[in-house]
């Protein structure tokens, strides 16, 4: 197994249930420090090649960095490599049984997609999820610039960033769409919310409402596993810390509809809320319908997101076009649905 940490733990849990044992663990050369993981000394890839004549590599972490992805693809050229598709926010695995159970919905979504590129990417993603073969991911990759310039219509006057992290996507949207004059941003992680507001305090000429909230379908207090941004999810059993050090605490949630009064705006909404996309959409219905709305929706946090969220969105916005794009990442993260007029 290549990699350690939370991703490896999740894969090992599935392997244990299947009665499959990991023979050894290895890390990138610069990260081999003589330490152990799950009772085994962590080796380098060179040591693995010296120890085993034939072996299968399971990739247990992800990256969008070009040099790291090049390393993944390089190892895949040397030996058999798979990147298991585990849901980021838990739940069912996207295995053959799950696919067959939901095949009718999967096929309906394919028919709804607006262009052939979207359908090719959709096919590649399903093939990857069922096989773990990362060559499908490389074939599906497109640059985000194409979507932001050529798929979305632009000219937005307002922007809602649900899952605003440290302000990176807010900064990106203002660069692509300088006509934006009103922004609502949700970010529940305290550490990254501080970074977000440090950035928004520097933005001039734009009315920004930053909310230290989880995007949800109602006003509610929930248990939050605070992974400091990207890994912050609703859920947890008790307040404290996880074994990986994430804080588990109470947090306030609210609907986007309760935090803005947008009407008649050319509005872009981004949903990247770590598995709460369905509820966040439910909490946005007034806002969506009161404005000329386009959306960017993440489809990779739960196994069913790839088909359940497009079906929900089509029901809400039947006249909008649905474009699917996957931006460079291994495993199948950064999958976005672009919902356009």
PLM features per residue range, with description:
Residues 2, 6-18, 22-23, 28-341:
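Phosphate/nucleotide-binding beta-alpha loop and adjacent structural elements of enzyme active sites
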